[in-house]
């Protein structure tokens, strides 16, 4: 995650947060070179993950259902959206243990089992190990 390039700072309080603290936090984020965005209500996953999770879920469902291969799903996403990375590149960046742990007892156990069989059991955990859906330079 290249925070110095993709420099959004999501600022979210809780019902117990003094509203007077939001402005100084937003200002501090700006001083650090971030682009602050205030989230008005408490939301698990904030904004970015709330937008990202449906994409990753759709991509994993397309793969598990045998509809398309990761490279083709990524190609469609990157070309159509002008995005620098596709969903399976994002999975590799996040690390495959994270979607496995989220999915195995949650919303997507089929994908979690797929990850375990095809990648995790083979030591392919994503960028951190040099290979996941894609191969990377030695970590």
Each PLM stretch: what is its role?
Residues 11-15, 54-57:
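Short, hinge-like loop/turn segments at secondary-structure boundaries
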Residues 4, 56, 81-83:
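Short acidic (Asp/Glu) and glycine-rich catalytic loops that position anionic groups and cofactors
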Residues 16-26, 30-43, 60, 64-139:
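NAD(P)-dependent Rossmann-like dehydrogenase/reductase catalytic/cofactor-binding core
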Residues 2, 44-46:
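A short acidic, often aromatic-flanked loop/helix-cap motif at beta-alpha or helix-coil junctions
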Residues 1-3, 55, 101-104:
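Short alpha-helical interface patches
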Residues 2-12:
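Acidic/polar active-site rim loop that often engages polyanionic ligands
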């Amino acid at each position: 995650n290249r925070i110095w390039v993709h420099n959004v700072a999501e600022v979210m309080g809780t019902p117990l947060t003094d509203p007077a603290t939001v402005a100084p936090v937003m200002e501090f984020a700006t001083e650090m070179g971030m682009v602050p965005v205030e989230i008005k209500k408490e939301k698990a996953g904030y904004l970015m993950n709330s937008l990202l999770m449906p994409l990753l879920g759709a991509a994993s469902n397309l793969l598990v259902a045998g509809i398309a291969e990761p490279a083709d799903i990524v190609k469609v996403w990157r070309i159509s959206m002008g995005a620098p990375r596709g969903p399976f590149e994002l999975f590799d960046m996040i690390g495959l243990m994270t979607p496995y742990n989220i999915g195995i007892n949650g919303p997507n156990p089929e994908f979690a089992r797929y990850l375990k069989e095809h990648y995790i059991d083979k030591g392919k955990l994503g960028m951190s190990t040099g290979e996941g859906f894609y191969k990377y330079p030695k970590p």
